[in-house]
Amino acid sequence: MSNNETITNYTIKPHGGELINRVVEGNERERLIEEALKFKPITLNPWGISDLELIGIGGFSPLTGFMNKEDYTKVIEETHLSNGLVWSIPITLPVTESEAEKLEIGDDIALYGEDGQLYGTLKLEEKYTYDKEKEARLVYGTTEEAHPGVKKVYEKGNIYLGGPIKLLNRPKHDAFSNYHLDPSETRQLFHDLGWKTVVGFQTRNPVHRAHEYIQKSALEIVDGLLLNPLVGETKSDDIPADVRMESYEVILKNYYPEDRARLVIYPAAMRYAGPREAILHATVRKNYGCTHFIVGRDHAGVGDYYGTYEAQELITQFEDELGIQILKFEHAFYCEACGNMATAKTCPHDASQHLHLSGTKVREKLRNGESLPTKFSRPEVAEVLIKGLREK
């Protein structure tokens, strides 16, 4: 086994056994950028660009491009790719019917962002129609347009393009450049740190005491923690990524052992697909080199669309196939009678002793400049959030 293979497989093999790399560099990149000027162009929205990047860097291994109809259908109907691997969310490239009419099978297509930047190319293998309501129902569990993920599906063009991609330019994550590591780089990092077991934690929210309790409980049984916050597109009322990132820096610096935790961004859009998205999140963290993944209450949920532990129940069905160990945690809270953080598994007291704050209530307090109870949030974290939101 080569040294590169040793590092790639140090903690866990990527999904499908190979870490995909569709990033084009050097002379080939220069040549392709020049050639792409003659290709038919398509503009991708931020969601599409983040998917393109994750395919390119191997975060979505084993995908090498946007899904063809066979894979798409298998994924939405059976939660698997056509090759038999577990996959829960369709990764697709939508266009309008008028755009699709201009494209021929076999075309090389230039993929631009809304900023006018060329990000990559697609070799067009397939154009196909799809049923939006069916996709919404099977992937999101609802056809209601009030669901932010479903709304996105309904707003998309009516045709999907399938084919392999090449990644020529990367979206800029300048504000987070210190924390922008690709799966090959996190795997190298874990090797260098000597972490054989790593737990991944997905978040789009600040880390409050309940999250800290869960992360540290997991850290008791593994070598390291990968705090892997999503920094792509989220709902407008979610706390902005730059404010959240500062809060992560503060809590790691003050409350976590330096040699046991690392902060790395996950440059994806949030789909709010609940149980199905939990499976995707676990798959991606496996590709980043995590051996364990935390799934808590209402993982990747929104509103009241999913049951509290529905994501845990679904992912348990696929855990053996996924090959990453799922750590399932109940909702954590501060118990006045216990005098510490706890869950229903460890606390005998009734709800009157438990401190609960909903995400909505937390955001409301922060935007009003109100401090959060120290039993709920570390004061340094609350300070960063209040200051950050006041400046927005």
From Swiss-Prot:
Which EC class, in a word? transferase
Gene3D superfamilies given in the database record: HUPs, Sulfate adenylyltransferase
Q: Which reaction is catalysed here?
A: sulfate + ATP + H(+) = adenosine 5'-phosphosulfate + diphosphate
**Cross-referenced Pfam families, in alphabetical order?**
ATP-sulfurylase, PUA_2
Per the UniProt entry, the signal peptide is none
Gene Ontology terms for molecular function: ATP binding; sulfate adenylyltransferase (ATP) activity
Sorted keywords for this record are: ATP-binding, Nucleotide-binding, Nucleotidyltransferase, Transferase
- Family annotation (SUPFAM superfamilies): Nucleotidylyl transferase (SSF52374), PUA domain-like (SSF88697)
- In the Enzyme Commission scheme, what number(s) does this protein have? 2.7.7.4
- Pathway this chain belongs to: Sulfur metabolism; hydrogen sulfide biosynthesis; sulfite from sulfate: step 1/3
An annotated GO BP: hydrogen sulfide biosynthetic process
* NCBIfam families named among the record's database cross-references: PRK04149.1, sopT
The UniProt family comment states:
Belongs to the sulfate adenylyltransferase family.
Q: Which protein are we looking at?
A: Sulfate adenylyltransferase
Organism (species)? Staphylococcus epidermidis (strain ATCC 35984 / DSM 28319 / BCRC 17069 / CCUG 31568 / BM 3577 / RP62A)
Gene name, please?
sat
